[in-house]
């Protein structure tokens, strides 16, 4: 397949000889347009970019200072949109020779054939994978699936083939450093961008010592983005609870002259809960999960979830109290049980709303 219409984007900071090996491999495997970004490298490393620029197929973009991998990628995307009108897409590659050129070509060809954004994913079960990388990927993928609702085998892969139609969006999202790649995945979800995964070789050179990834700072930036969905869901729930309680008090005070006893409580509780539920539904649909589900259908599913959840709260609380023989007069233990049940149902509600009520219909093909 002709790859002249695919640009390779290659961000690099303080490279060594491996950068030239990467470029030679890409050229040997049919790529004819490489956008190399010097992200503020030190003067003693600039000769690698000069050597690379001697190839007519290589265009070098320079950052005067280190701006981060995300900024380098976005700068290249913007350059391609303005200067490569015939490019059908790009494939991003790391400059440390961890992406084999055959895998890069496979991802680019798959993107051209399907029109889908394509991720080159590593197999972290291989024995030569550093333990830190293996455990880190497992944790990140699990957290990503739980709190974002996307099943991705390798959330930090730098090998990504991206159709031109997605470049304008992806060049405008936030994040200038390693967190940008996580923001890209989140943008794929919220904008319903279909994606596929292609298995690639898992290569670690010298325990990945050449990586500029800062373990604590960059990990915090990434996890902060992943947990943002859950944080917004928590805020939405708290605001709805405040509205629920406030409306109950207002209605109770306003209607006590015409209603009394059970009728007053029932009208106040049901009305307050209904209005606060509608508010919670709207916030979750528009601001938390950014769902494109039809409003009526999503609302029906929301209440289908809410009603059983109410009974589950009662049955679980009562069941635990009975099973463990908690005395009815022991208000502290009963309160602890109720709080634990509420926390359990809160996580369950988040998961069900994310994966069913407001489910984003990203389509991912089977791994090849």
Regions found by a protein language model. Name each.
Residues 38-47, 65, 97-98:
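A conserved acidic beta->alpha catalytic loop
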Residues 18-21, 42-52, 102:
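Acidic helix N-cap motif at the loop->helix transition within catalytic regions
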Residues 14-28:
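Short, well-formed alpha-helical segments that are part of the catalytic scaffolds
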